[in-house]
């Protein structure tokens, strides 16, 4: 009986194994039969996997491994997961048939062709292909929700808003990113400025506050004392004008007749006072603004005081006169502004300013008016003097600070070495090249006489007028208005036009000589390059003024680019451009009257020759003097002798010149100086000798000779009048003599020796010595 049971159990197990093998074989056969049909579906799945990379990872986790497939348990699972076609109910089959078209829609017609003929490439598989997907059943029975759109290869949820709103938001964000930081900080919305004032500011072209205006607004508006320093042309006037006007607008005012001013603004010049007054008037229609300065009748000013004044702008002299006459009451002052404070507190105005302010100020009183000091230059002594007018808790805003460059960063600084006898003619050429007939130029002179003479010099081809203290005030105002309006292009002025004047579109500023103090240079150069525009400032200097130029460089934190006078080529090129622009301004009605003459001229000379002659005559460049690029002397041409190695001394160049051109070249070469790095020299020769020199000279591997078209870069500025020199004029240091021998100063003949020693007499030596070291020392240090 037990044996029978064992045999029965063994038979049952054998039967079960046979059934399992039979079932496995049937399943494999069915898979082989279904494989061709499922190829296409698998390709669809692969296509979907490229679209949904995350789903592919889920599939891999869901599919069993080969090891699991071989185990009995896995076989049962597989059997359940993949029932045969016979086991599928008719209802399930019908559902599958309905969902098959949805799966087919996923694949584009182009993809279908690829899957039928060949397998897709790696690029096609890897490339993201965003598609709108509905819920669909995959081969493993999993369902997938509608897929979000892909953006840059990654899922990206659809926005709640419509596409036009999204695009507008993106464009707005881009615009915000493009707005400079200065405009964001200076936006009107950041400050308590009324809509009426904003409208008036926009009428002046102001759409946001400049940095100095933004950083000082709240200090001024809150009533704090302030010292502010910023570069020229950055909008310092509106820095105090806007907040003061808003403050007065917000206060209840008794606008009765004869009221005393609440704001006093003192300026050093009449022109600046007039300009500041206009700036106030342009941005307020409710307040009464008056401007008092010398050279104008008293009657009109008395009438303004009788009617009542809210804001008074003026120069110290006329304000002081009204106080002494008992006509002007300053006891009600709440705000005092000193514009260009360094000049207002200097020796020329200090006594007058103190007398004016003593009326409204009490010593060590917290009830004194609010004091506002503005300038582009604030030396240390200004702070010491200003403290007696300011409260102990004053604010300081400095947009220059410890920065090296004190001048406007939009101005290019150039320097031309020129003897005073040639200066007027060279200035005329400089205006042609750097400004032209259509541009505006301001020339600053040290004296009234020089300004008057230069404005009438025939070398300046453009219309020019002068502006200085000897001109009646009425004429000064007419002249300044004409220059602003473009009635003439060149203004020759003394320092009356140096400070504060905001003249639009000044292309060029010329200083006839280095100023005595660096503050004057900073303010003069600041007449160009204003409000973001670029400009050029050219300073003329003589050999004896080179030390002053170096001092300006060091104190103003700038570096002059030493240039030569404009060459004939540059002058003609600039003049022709001006002439062409002038042709555009000729009306068609005038042209018709000259057509017959033009046709006749073309027949005689040809079109090009006739037009070239006409342009030359229009430009005034019928004859252009050739000038030295080194010292501006007329009748000379500058030549460059380049050397392939660094020259030990200047006699090295003399030796080569004499070998090729003969000893007579000694009398023709003038003012030889080293090029940068001592890789050659440049010198002047008479214009008549240029052709002869070029014919005799032959370039070699070491030496090349050419005519200079612009001033080459020379071997460093000679600071303090010392160092090695290659010019006949000079100071202490070595000299490059004309005979080609290097000697110490004090030797004109004989062997090389110590300073002051000569083989040929002592008196001349002593005189030479005195002209050397002692003389240059006194020049350098003002002794």
UniProtKB/Swiss-Prot annotation:
Residues 1-43, 135-148, 726-752 have a biased composition (Basic and acidic residues). Residues 724-748 are annotated as: 3 X 5 AA repeats. Pfam families: DEAD (PF00270), GUCT (PF08152), Helicase_C (PF00271). Residues 217-396 form the Helicase ATP-binding domain. Residues 429-573 form the Helicase C-terminal domain. It is found in: Nucleus, Nucleolus; Nucleus, Nucleoplasm; Cytoplasm, Cytosol; Mitochondrion. It is an enzyme of class 3 (hydrolase). PANTHER family: ATP-DEPENDENT RNA HELICASE RHLE-RELATED, NUCLEOLAR RNA HELICASE 2-A. Autoantibodies against DDX21 are found in patients with watermelon stomach disease, which is characterized by prominent stripes of ectatic vascular tissue in the stomach similar to stripes on a watermelon. This is Nucleolar RNA helicase 2.
